[in-house]
Amino acid sequence: MFFLYTDFFLSLVAVPAAAPVCQPKSATNGQPPAPAPTPTPRLSISSRATVVARMEGTSQGGLQTVMKWKTVVAIFVVVVVYLVTGGLVFRALEQPFESSQKNTIALEKAEFLRDHVCVSPQELETLIQHALDADNAGVSPIGNSSNNSSHWDLGSAFFFAGTVITTIGYGNIAPSTEGGKIFCILYAIFGIPLFGFLLAGIGDQLGTIFGKSIARVEKVFRKKQVSQTKIRVISTILFILAGCIVFVTIPAVIFKYIEGWTALESIYFVVVTLTTVGFGDFVAGGNAGINYREWYKPLVWFWILVGLAYFAAVLSMIGDWLRVLSKKTKEEVGEIKAHAAEWKANVTAEFRETRRRLSVEIHDKLQRAATIRSMERRRLGLDQRAHSLDMLSPEKRSVFAALDTGRFKASSQESINNRPNNLRLKGPEQLNKHGQGASEDNIINKFGSTSRLTKRKNKDLKKTLPEDVQKIYKTFRNYSLDEEKKEEETEKMCNSDNSSTAMLTDCIQQHAELENGMIPTDTKDREPENNSLLEDRN
């Protein structure tokens, strides 16, 4: 609560603090203002500096970061869970003691009424109510209340005013009159920000003192070549230990000796006070049975002032460290994301490069395979063509040789390459080996297949023959008119005997050869042999 008031009212005075940055002399001479000297790094950053930085950032461009709603909701959920956890723990620890106290007071009242028959229960309740009212008014009902001790003497009133402006509010004493309550309201409104200024100044001075001390420690460790992180950790530990010794341990020992508390109760009071919680169950100088010195309560308030400044410096330092840590964490996360994106890009590029290389290699292999296959097809076509030419008569071979010397070679080779599947013939060596043990019927069938192949080839050749070759072909055609008559006779013979497959094949072969310009000279030589074969078959 107190630190919220401090931040709010410090923001009101933060604007005038930024005014000395301007230098009138340099401004009038037309020169840019000299840069302000960079302050030495300090361990603690006061609330005033933080507020000034926020004001300057807002005035320069409105770049002040705003917490997102998701973050606010997440923090709210964490706080609620923290509160529920604390409530469960406190209930488990304190509720049994409260129940035992209720049973104890009920038994005490019953025993008192039984021992004192003249006192009615109503009179006892009235007495207890008066005791509670006196305690709430700051008067202890224990002992003789007619002594000279008072909760509103100068020392006690000064201590109460200190608890108001420090927002501790122990609650052991409070104003009971209407005038006192009204004055307390106004006094708190103007006193809390005033004390905030004082607290900020003391925090700056404490931060400067401890910063110089820590700088000396850092110099000592730098000579020993210790890393910067270790130096800061050691400096922080030393700062916290020194503050705990000065503002927690020593006051706890003093309170234990003066107030008669245990060590736990003394430390409990110190921490509750310096954190401005102030439950009021333990208050320094609140025991009516102890005769305190006049300077005791003002000294306690001065300790509260310096201790609050120390705790404010520590909390501010922790907040700054959390901001720096959050910023570094964001930067590290950004770097991790950048590295991840770079790694992903590299992996993608390598994958693409590998895929490209594989595709190129596969394409090259396919090209090589296609080239080898094409070469094999060409070689097979040439072998088959040579085999077909070997089966022709010498006159036809001479004609094809004359055609090969011209432009027919490329056209015939292209025709063979375009139709490799139609040239499924065996090589000459295999044909010779197979022909040695084959029957006459197989020989006739082979000649028939050769004639069909020759017919197909000559159909393609006709389409690609140039004009000069066509003239040679026509001349050769006129020269073989006598042979055409023999073809007609052979066709008549084929028509008369349709049941003979071999003769039909021979007729088709002769017809195809004559039709394509091939004149088999050995036809007459084979006629007697074919006739004898047909007679034997019939």
Swiss-Prot record:
Catalytic activity: K(+)(in) = K(+)(out); Rb(+)(in) = Rb(+)(out); Cs(+)(in) = Cs(+)(out)
Annotated phenotype, changing Y310A: Near complete loss of channel gating by mechanical membrane stretch
Sugar-modified residues: N144, N147, N148
Consequence the record notes for mutating Y310F: Reduces channel gating by mechanical membrane stretch
Region of interest: Selectivity filter 2: 276-281
Residues that hold K(+) 1 according to the record: T167, I168, T276, V277
Topology feature Cytoplasmic, residues: 1-71, 203-233, 320-538
Regulation: Activated by various stimuli including acidic pH, anesthetics chloroform, halothane and isoflurane, mechanical stretch, lipids such as arachidonic, docosahexaenoic and linoleic polyunsaturated fatty acids and lysophosphatidylcholine and lysophosphatidylinositol lysophospholipids. Inhibited by norfluoxetine, the active metabolite of antidepressant fluoxetine (Prozac).
Regions crossing the membrane: 72-92, 182-202, 234-254, 299-319
Positions of K(+) 2 binding: I168, G169, V277, G278
Annotated residues for binding of K(+) 3: G169, Y170, G278, F279
Region annotation Disordered: where it falls in the sequence: 412-443, 510-538
GO CC annotation terms, alphabetical: monoatomic ion channel complex; plasma membrane
Basic and acidic residues biased stretches: 522-538
GO biological process: cellular response to arachidonate; potassium ion transmembrane transport; signal transduction
Biased composition range(s): Polar residues: 412-421
Keyword hit for rRNA-binding: no
Gene3D superfamilies to which the protein is assigned, alphabetical: 1.10.287.70
Region (Selectivity filter 1): 167-172
Keywords attached to this entry: Cell membrane, Disulfide bond, Glycoprotein, Ion channel, Ion transport, Membrane, Potassium, Potassium channel, Potassium transport, Transmembrane, Transmembrane helix, Transport, Voltage-gated channel
InterPro entries per the UniProt record, alphabetical: 2pore_dom_K_chnl, 2pore_dom_K_chnl_TREK, K_chnl_dom
Top-level lineage group: Eukaryota
Subunit structure: Homodimer; disulfide-linked. Forms heterodimers with other 2-pore domain K(+) channel subunits, such as KCNK2, KCNK4 and KCNK18.
Cited function: K(+) channel that conducts voltage-dependent outward rectifying currents upon membrane depolarization. Voltage sensing is coupled to K(+) electrochemical gradient in an 'ion flux gating' mode where outward but not inward ion flow opens the gate. Converts to voltage-independent 'leak' conductance mode upon stimulation by various stimuli including mechanical membrane stretch, acidic pH, heat and lipids. Homo- and heterodimerizes to form functional channels with distinct regulatory and gating properties.
Domain comment in the entry: Each subunit contributes two pore-forming domains 1 and 2 which assemble to form a single pore with M2 and M4 transmembrane helices lining the central cavity and M1 and M3 facing the lipid bilayer. The transmembrane helices are bridged by the selectivity filters 1 and 2 carrying a signature sequence TxTTxGYGD that coordinate the permeant ions. Up to four ions can simultaneously occupy the selectivity filter and at least two elementary charges must translocate across the filter to convert it into the open conformation.
Protein's recorded name: Potassium channel subfamily K member 10
Lineage: Eukaryota, Metazoa, Chordata, Craniata, Vertebrata
